[in-house]
């Protein structure tokens, strides 16, 4: 199932050898199930904003349900990773007290996958999106659902490496 990782590695330039080696390690040897690790990678790729990259990853994943859930998570986190830090940065109690009035149904519906997996995809996208509030909420949520610290670490590792890949791709 992870043949796409080998294809991706071929596009990474030699100056990014660490990234090339890390992409293999974080996905193929993750503590997460393979399908989940791949979809975590896709959610992170989506969050990088490199549409050529994430659409390619989306196209090569075999599990369409997980792939679609990952981009759904990436999409809603693209909104929330901006909205929640904005509220905090504005530092206005009146603003904080107002409802967001933004649709967030994807979170309640889990993008067609399990709640746990959708949370993992949201965490990956939020790590790349650098939203402290979203990272903390999804990290704590997953920990409460039984994810180990090793699994949570691996979500972070996948997100970090996919972010790096998005910056070094030349093809």
Which residues are covered by each model-predicted region?
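Hydrophobic alpha-helical segments
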Residues: 1-171
């Amino acid at each position: 199932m992870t043949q796409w990782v080998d294809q991706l590695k071929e596009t990474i330039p030699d100056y990014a050898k660490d990234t090339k080696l890390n992409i293999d390690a974080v996905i193929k040897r993750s503590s997460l199930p393979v399908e989940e690790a791949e979809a975590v990678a896709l959610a992170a790729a989506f969050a990088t904003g490199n549409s050529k990259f994430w659409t390619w990853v989306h196209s090569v994943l075999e599990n369409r349900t997980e792939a679609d859930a990952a981009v759904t998570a990436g999409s809603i986190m693209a909104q929330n990773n901006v909205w929640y830090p904005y509220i905090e940065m504005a530092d206005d109690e009146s603003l904080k007290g107002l409802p967001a009035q933004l649709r967030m149904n994807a979170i309640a519906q889990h993008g067609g996958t399990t709640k746990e997996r959708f949370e993992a995809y949201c965490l990956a996208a939020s790590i790349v999106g650098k939203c402290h509030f979203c990272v903390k909420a999804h990290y704590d949520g997953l920990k409460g659902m039984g994810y180990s610290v090793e699994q949570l670490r691996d979500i972070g590792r996948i997100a970090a490496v996919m972010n790096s890949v998005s910056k070094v791709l030349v093809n």
